[in-house]
Amino acid sequence: ERHTQILDEESEFSVEDLIADEMMVVTVSNAGYIKRLPVSTYRKQRRGGKGITGMETKDEDFVRDLFIASTHQYMLFFSNAGRVYWRKVHELPRAGRTARGRAIVNLLELSGGEFITACLPVRDLKEEGKTVFMVTNKGVVKKTLLKSFSNPRATGIIAIDIDEGDELIDVQITTGEDNILLATAKGKAIRFPEKDVRSMGRTARGVVGIRMEDGDSVIGMSLAADESTVLTVTENGFGKRTKVGEYRLQHRGG
């Protein structure tokens, strides 16, 4: 008696089904070079060890971002022009430990003068309750639901409408319940609840997050939990550590 059955059925199959779900170290340099390599490349050492070279950089270049992400995760790339691009981690160039990697401009369809200012690893683009919080050089902030970025396009899509002369400088994934800390080049800072900023569509401009004097600009953003501390470092190497609670919580636009 024959037990073999031939079924006339179709099943969905993608190249990703053949790619192992492996944890990778993704590094991005300030000059815009990116690469990935397995976490296992970095052997565990004791405290006080010398460490190993993780990326070769040219003069005046340095590693700006480092992420641990699965090969099946997405990387969202946000540009200074307010656009967002996608790549799966397994699509990023795999290179040796000391290699520079590949220029991001050769991976994404960027316009002239456009460069990447923020990278975010994301497992599920349709995850409920997650938002994307953005800030520009001139202090404009905007919050958009993560699922609004779930339809990738090779040419990217608008993440925020940028005013002339302004640039997107930082992006974070938030829960909708976080506190936001913005810092400026002249040493000013503001901490306000994320709830002060309503969710907006992708093409919206955003609202004022901090008001600044002429010549000042926002240089960074952090999620500021009440029990955390803030490390502030100046261009000349001076630094200090401050409890977040010393930055009083106020409304956005202060």
Question: Model features per residue range: what roles?
Answer:
Residues E1-G254:
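Short, structured "edge-of-domain" segments at secondary-structure transitions
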